[in-house]
Amino acid sequence: MSPRPSRLSAGVVVVRQAEEGWKFLLLRAFNHWDFPKGMVEPGEEALAAAIREVREETLLDDLEFDWGRDWTSTGPYSHGKIARYYIARTSTESITLPVNPVLGRPEHSEFRWVDYDGAQQLVSPRVRPVLRWAAQAMNLPTPRSASGG
């Protein structure tokens, strides 16, 4: 087991089953689209932090970890921060972006439920491997797996 990085954030790849297939929840902050995530507080477990962050950023409280509690991480951001992501399902389509009491406004300006291809186009190159990992864990076809590579 590798040591915990000095700056760890935790988040959840939140998915929802729609009529046309699985949708991924993306949140927009400034010009960046990402999955819900935030810093792990001292003494807090990463999974607990991930669940807390989803609730704080979206008010979702019905997460089901159908694919277990496995996780993947991004490479280090500046200042050594690493983001750890889990996968969870929600049945809630309507998302609320509540006001953050510290900021006095919502942390995110927009949310979208998008399919795998849409998510692939919106997320940053750093987050694309997380999206691929989640899709593979869910046994969804991805361009790489569909081509046999």
Regions found by a protein language model. Give the residues of each.
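Active-site-adjacent beta-strand/loop module that shapes the phosphate/pyrophosphate-binding cleft
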Residues: 8, 71-99, 112, 134-141
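Short histidine/acidic/glycine/proline-rich micro-motifs that form metal-
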Residues: 40-41, 73, 118
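N-terminal strand-loop-strand
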Residues: 1-35
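The catalytic Nudix box helix
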Residues: 35-69
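Short secondary-structure boundary/capping segments
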Residues: 4, 25, 77-78, 102-104
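Short, charged/polar surface micro-motifs in flexible loops or helix N-caps
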Residues: 19-20, 30-33, 41, 79, ...
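Nudix hydrolase/Nudix homology domain
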Residues: 30-33, 95-149
